[in-house]
C-alpha cells in the first residue's frame, strides 16, 4: 500500500462495430482517446471511513462507513451515486475474500479519501465558454482550466459520449485494487485482466444490464479490436447479496469462461482522430433497444445486413493494418504519399502512385460502404443511426483535403461525429468547417487518438491534478 494511489483510464470511440459488438460473432474496432479519468486515493484521519469527491460537480461528495462485516453504510443521505457505491461495495467484498480480513482492515485503519476527476472533453463545456464570453473553438477550450467545474449535477450534465461511466469505473476499480495491494502494477497483463473482469461486472451491475463491454475493455487495454465475452458469465452474480466465494470464482483471472478477445490496434502513422460534440443528445440505450427489437421481429433481414456490415467492417480494419505494414516496409514512400494526399481531396488520391495511395482510397471507400449500411439499418429499424443532418455534415467534412473518413461513433445518433485525418491542417480545416456550420451546433473536442489503456501516472505528469492531493 502507498499513501497516495493514482490511476487513470481513457475514453473511447467505436470506429467500426456499432451494434454488432453486442454479439460474440462480431468484432469492433475501438480507439481510445487522450481524454482520461483519474482516481486519487489517499489516507484520511477517520478509520473505516471512505469519502468520495467529484469536485467537477455540484452535490457530489459522499461519505461511507465500512461496518465490521465490510458492508458500506452511507453517512451522506441527501444524494447517492450508484456507480461509486457499487464499485466500493463489490470491490471490498472481493478483496476480503481474496486477501483476507486482516489485509483489508489494515488499509481501512487510516480510512480512504477518494477524488475522481475527468478531463474536460467528457462533458460539454458550452456553459463555461458562454460564461467567459468565449466562442466554441479548440483555442477557447484549451484556455479552460483542467478538470474545470461543470456547474451541473451528475444528473443534469451534458455528456459528450466518450464513455465517462466506463472510464470512471475502470479507474476507480484499478485504484482500489492497487491501493489495497491486490494488484502491483496496473499495466501488467495479469493486473489488466483482474481490473477488466471486476470493472466489467461493476459497470454492468450499476447499469442494470450486461452490455457489450467494449467501453470498459478499451478503458483497460486502450485501442484494440474487440470481441465480447459471453454475457452468461455474469448472470449468477448479478445479485446484491451475491456469495463472496462465487463472486471471486467468477471474476478470477483463472476463470476460463472469460472468453473476451483483445487484439492490439493502432491508427497508422500520421493518422489522427478529430471529434465533435453536437448539441442535440441521443439516448444510446433507446437507439440500441429499437435496433434489437427490429432484429428480433425481422431476423432474416437483419442477419443479411449484419453479415454484410461485418464484412465491410473487417475490410476497414484490414486497410488500417495494410497501411501500418506499408509504413514499416516502405517508410519513405509511405511518408511522401501521406504528405501528398494530405493536401488533396479523397477522390484525387487515385492520381498518386503506389500501393499506399491505393490502400488509402480503398480505406475511404470501404468506410463509405459501412456508413451506407448503417443508414440502411437506420431506415429499416426506424432509428436515426446517421440522421440526415449528420449525413450533410459528414459529407461536408469529406470535402476537406486530408480527411480519410468521417462518421458517427458507436450506436450513432445526433450527439457526436468523428473524422480521421492525415494532417494537422486537415484537423484545423475540419474544425473551421464545424465553427461555420449553421444547420447544427457543432463544437470541437480536444481529444486525440491515444492507444494507451489503464495507467498509474505521477501527479507531476498531469497538469492540474496536484490541487486534488491532500
Segments predicted by a language model, with ranges:
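DPxDG-like acidic metal-binding loop motif
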Residues: 161-184
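C-terminal nucleotide
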Residues: 1-16, 20-22, 30-113, 117-158, ...
Amino acid at each position: 500500500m502507498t499513501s497516495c494511489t493514482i490511476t487513470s483510464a481513457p475514453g473511447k470511440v467505436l470506429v467500426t462495430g456499432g451494434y454488432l459488438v453486442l454479439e460474440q460473432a462480431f468484432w469492433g474496432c475501438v480507439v481510445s482517446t487522450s481524454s482520461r479519468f483519474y482516481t486519487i486515493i489517499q489516507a484520511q484521519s477517520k478509520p473505516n471511513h471512505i469519502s468520495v469527491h467529484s469536485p467537477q460537480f455540484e452535490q457530489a461528495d459522499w461519505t461511507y462507513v465500512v461496518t465490521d462485516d465490510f458492508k458500506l453504510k452511507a453517512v451522506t443521505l441527501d444524494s447517492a451515486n450508484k456507480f461509486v457505491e457499487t464499485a466500493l461495495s463489490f470491490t471490498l467484498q472481493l478483496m476480503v475474500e481474496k486477501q483476507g480480513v486482516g489485509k483489508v482492515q489494515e488499509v481501512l485503519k487510516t480510512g480512504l479519501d477518494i477524488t475522481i476527476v475527468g478531463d474536460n472533453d467528457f462533458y460539454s463545456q458550452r456553459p463555461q465558454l458562454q460564461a467567459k464570453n468565449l466562442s466554441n473553438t479548440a483555442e477557447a477550450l484549451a484556455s479552460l482550466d483542467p478538470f474545470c467545474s461543470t456547474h451541473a449535477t451528475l444528473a443534469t450534465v451534458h455528456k459528450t459520449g466518450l464513455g465517462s461511466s466506463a472510464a470512471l469505473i475502470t479507474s476507480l476499480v484499478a485504484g482500489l485494487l492497487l491501493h489495497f495491494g491486490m494488484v502491483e502494477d496496473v499495466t501488467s497483463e495479469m493486473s489488466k485482466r483482474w481490473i477488466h473482469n471486476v470493472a466489467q461486472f461493476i459497470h454492468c451491475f450499476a447499469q442494470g444490464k450486461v452490455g457489450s463491454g467494449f467501453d470498459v475493455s478499451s478503458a483497460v487495454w486502450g485501442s484494440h479490436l474487440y470481441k465480447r465475452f459471453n454475457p452468461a458469465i455474469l448472470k449468477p452474480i448479478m445479485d446484491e447479496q451475491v456469495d463472496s466465494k462465487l463472486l471471486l470464482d467468477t471474476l478470477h483471472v483463472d476463470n476460463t469462461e472469460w472468453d473476451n478477445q483483445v487484439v492490439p490496434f493502432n491508427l497508422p502513422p500520421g493518422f489522427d482522430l478529430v471529434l465533435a460534440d453536437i448539441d442535440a443528445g441521443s439516448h444510446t440505450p433507446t437507439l440500441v433497444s429499437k435496433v434489437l427489437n427490429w432484429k428480433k421481429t425481422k431476423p432474416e433481414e437483419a442477419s443479411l445486413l449484419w453479415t454484410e456490415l461485418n464484412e465491410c467492417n473487417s475490410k476497414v480494419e484490414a486497410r488500417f493494418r495494410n497501411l501500418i505494414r506499408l509504413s514499416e516496409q516502405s517508410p519513405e514512400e509511405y511518408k511522401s504519399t501521406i504528405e501528398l494526399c494530405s493536401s488533396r481531396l479523397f477522390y484525387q488520391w487515385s492520381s498518386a502512385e503506389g500501393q499506399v495511395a491505393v490502400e488509402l482510397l480503398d480505406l475511404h471507400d470501404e468506410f463509405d460502404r459501412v456508413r451506407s449500411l448503417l443508414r440502411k439499418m437506420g431506415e429499416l429499424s426506424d432509428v436515426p443511426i446517421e440522421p440526415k443532418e449528420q449525413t450533410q455534415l459528414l459529407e461536408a467534412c469529406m470535402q476537406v483535403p486530408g480527411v480519410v473518413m468521417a462518421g458517427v461513433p458507436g450506436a450513432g445518433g445526433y450527439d457526436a461525429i468523428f473524422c480521421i485525418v492525415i494532417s494537422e491542417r486537415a484537423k484545423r480545416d475540419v474544425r473551421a468547417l464545424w465553427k461555420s456550420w449553421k444547420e447544427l451546433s457543432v463544437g470541437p473536442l480536444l481529444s486525440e487518438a491515444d492507444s494507451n489503456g489503464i495507467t498509474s501516472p505521477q501527479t507531476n505528469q498531469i497538469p492540474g491534478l496536484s490541487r486534488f492531493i491532500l
